[in-house]
């Protein structure tokens, strides 16, 4: 309705610049983190486009500007992020991102990205909550265990397969040797069976209950003959 009234009155409407940031960012002490800020404007990006990054501590306090950009970045010379801010943006592409280096636990707080592109100077002011923590030793320990498992388990499986193949090869060799091994005369005599009616040895396959061998039967016959005498 107001846009229609302004158009009818011959006045150009005031459009808002749209700025986007991720609501949360998580960093680790001593590491770096990139804080993304993107924007779109209803007007072409001009040479006088300006960006301000502000910071407020988590426990409250005043909001301070930590970086100002206009044609080039101007980081703060004093304050919590002195010498730890890097401009990562490209305003021509609607990017106003920065990076924070050497994070500290005292960096926890809220950061905002504000962009002006005259005459488009009105817009939302989003915020990112920065949370910095000490790297979890438990996570490091789990990572070491995982990497060790990825190396050990395949090696153990390969070793097990090799042992199984070696055992099967040894068993096949033993079976082959037993099959082709020549029996001694004593073993041959134990395999033969005497016919009770004849003195000639027979060589059929042994029954389930093994009968006395030839030599043993001959000895038994000798004992029987001596008893009769």
UniProtKB/Swiss-Prot annotation:
Ranges for domain Ig-like V-type: 17-131
Name assigned to this protein: Myelin protein zero-like protein 3
Biological process according to GO: cell adhesion
One GO location term (cellular component): plasma membrane
SMART domains: IG (SM00409), IGv (SM00406)
InterPro entries reported for this sequence: Ig-like_dom, Ig-like_dom_sf, Ig-like_fold, Ig_sub, Ig_V-set, Myelin_P0-rel
Role this protein plays: Mediates homophilic cell-cell adhesion.
Positions of transmembrane segments: 144-164
Source species of the chain: Xenopus laevis (African clawed frog)
Gene label: mpzl3
Extracellular topological domain: 17-143
Topology in membrane: Single-pass type I membrane protein
Alphabetical UniProt keywords: Cell adhesion, Disulfide bond, Glycoprotein, Immunoglobulin domain, Membrane, Signal, Transmembrane, Transmembrane helix
Signal peptide: 1-16
Side of membrane Cytoplasmic, spans: 165-229
């Amino acid at each position: 309705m107001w846009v229609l009234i302004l158009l009818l009155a011959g006045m150009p409407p005031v459009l808002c610049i749209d700025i986007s940031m991720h609501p949360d960012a998580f960093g680790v002490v001593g590491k770096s983190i990139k804080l993304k800020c993107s924007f779109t404007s209803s007007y072409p990006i001009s040479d006088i486009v300006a960006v301000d990054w502000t910071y407020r501590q988590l426990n409250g306090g005043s909001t301070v500007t930590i970086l100002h950009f206009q044609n080039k970045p101007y980081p703060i010379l004093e304050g919590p992020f002195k010498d730890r801010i890097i401009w990562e943006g490209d305003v021509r592409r609607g990017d106003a991102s920065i990076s924070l280096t050497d994070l500290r636990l005292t960096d926890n707080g809220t950061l905002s990205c504000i962009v002006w592109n005259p005459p488009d100077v009105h817009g939302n002011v989003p915020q990112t909550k920065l949370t910095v923590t000490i790297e979890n030793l438990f996570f490091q320990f789990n990572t070491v265990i995982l990497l060790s498992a990825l190396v050990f388990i395949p090696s153990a499986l390969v070793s097990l397969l090799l042992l199984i193949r070696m055992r099967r090869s040894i068993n096949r060799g033993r079976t082959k040797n037993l099959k082709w091994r020549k029996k001694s005369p004593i073993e041959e005599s134990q395999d033969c069976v005497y016919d009770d009616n004849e003195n000639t040895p027979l060589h059929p396959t042994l029954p389930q209950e093994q009968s006395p061998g030839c030599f043993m039967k001959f000895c038994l016959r000798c004992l029987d003959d001596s008893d009769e005498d």
